[in-house]
Amino acid sequence: MVETALIFDANNLMYRAYHRFNSFTDVSGRPTSAIYGVPFVVEAQVRKFQPDLVIAVFDGARSKHRLKICPDYKGSRVQKLDFDKEDFLRQKEEVMEGLYNLGVSVVHNPDQEADDMIYSVVKLLQKQRVGTIIIISSDKDFNQLATTKDVVIYNPHSQEKITVNTCKHFKGYEAKQTVDYLTLVGDDSDNIKGYPLVGEKRAQQFLEKYGSIKAFLRGSEISSVVSKNALQKIYKKNHFLISLRAYHLKYMRDVKINWYKNQPFPTPNKSLFENYCGAFTLKSFLKDKGFYETFKSLSQRSIRSRKNNLS
């Protein structure tokens, strides 16, 4: 039985690494910020949590269904001035290959968002009765998945562990209220507008009082903060944009888990990884003897713990 699985929101890691290590280049001068940064972070978290299975999920296209409702959905990410999309995509291909050579299970569907695929992977692992599922991401959207004891959202930067028991402490709302909270305050990173003049405190107070937006809309009480008619319209739009469960239920056939090279359980290949390091001047990975051993040990744990293949 797989006791612990790590799921990496790989694009989230890539964006951070792309900017954090922006001075890194190979011998020809090509940027290698994400090529270096993503394996660096993944190895640190694998060493920290000692999982039996590691899955890195990469973003594809923005959801066509969400774009119909909100044409500017995630538009700000596309329009960043300090962002070289062509170079980012080049590095993304190399990162997927590098992680694969380390024995990391890589998921990528060019037509789907990572959030939706991560939701599907979580449901798959829960069906396989995996003991603990840890999602590595700083994206607050994933807090909505921490409604059962087996799911943990870990932010490697703040080091917060969001669970069904800790979400209220860290965020001021219950994990099950995440979608309603984001509906009220909006999400700037995704270009989703919330209810006018409702910020974090007002949203937390609203949810503390009413429990949920649905409960408020069904009740007879009138709020001085929000109008029921206006909130009803915003809720209908934002709930679909934000709720991974709602999207999954409506478009489940569209969300396919595509394993990189059709291999859900790749085997670490030291020779290929050394070639990867040589091609991109990643000498530190080769000098640190423990780096590759982290993934070799992961592979051994994975083989011992798996009884049924994921498909």
Task: Report residues per predicted region.
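Non-catalytic, usually N-terminal nucleic-acid engagement modules in DNA/RNA processing proteins
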Residues: 1-72
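Low-complexity, acidic/Ser/Thr- and charged residue-rich accessory regions of DNA metabolism proteins
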Residues: 2, 244-311
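Extended two-metal-dependent nuclease catalytic cores across DNA- and RNA-processing enzymes
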Residues: 2, 78-260, 304-305
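Short glycine-rich phosphate-binding loop at a beta-alpha junction
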Residues: 7, 52-59, 105-109, 132-136, ...
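Soluble or luminal CAZymes and related metallo-dependent hydrolases
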Residues: 33-37, 87, 113-114, 241, ...
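Hydrophobic, Leu/Ile/Phe/Ala-enriched alpha-helical segments that form helix-helix packing faces
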Residues: 42-46, 99, 125, 277
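Structural alpha-beta junctions
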Residues: 49-50, 101-105, 150, 278, ...
